[in-house]
Amino acid sequence: MDIYKKLKVKTYINAWDAVSAYGSSRMEEETLLAMREAATRFVHIEELQKAVGREIAKMTDNEAAYVVAGTAAGMLMASAVCMVRHPEPELFAMLPDASELRNEFILLRERKTSVGYAIKAAGGKVIDVAFGQHVTLEDVERAITPKTCAIVYCDTQVLSMRCPPLRALTLLAHKHDLFMAYRSEPEPVSY
């Protein structure tokens, strides 16, 4: 049975990229087998998340990793962590009311994406700096306030030509005790 025919959903050939809104990407057979095996038993999800995070962090040579259900979910989680800064449950419980926290995100992006909405959903305030224009490191630094918690760089080919290099932005973030978030974005579709 074809589930998409049953639901009357049109299928297509994805010749663009692994984009969440277009079904992301197809799963490898190994992944499908692991999911089938995992579905036969019950586990404590928090324990599973921690174990999988450790494994992915090792595989990707990172200090930590966390599995989410797409870009927007990942940015929402990252935004919450950037605002709270410390693993204190009572601070997370305040969200999405982040008015007492450092809750401003300097967002360098070329166009509207799910990233800005995810930041707002977590309780953050978006400060657009490079929306469709050239921007210098000084422009970004001028946008930093005592309420700023992170610089978020949504990389596209066009934006990378209009903004300071990622390394310079990261050093600026560290200089001001800010988190630096990087989101690699596919280029927009033209029809």
Placement of each model-derived feature along the sequence:
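Conserved PLP-enzyme active-site core in the AAT-like
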Residues: 1-22, 26, 53-67, 72-191
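A glycine-/small-polar-enriched, mobile loop at the entrance of the PLP active site in fold-type I
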Residues: 14-51
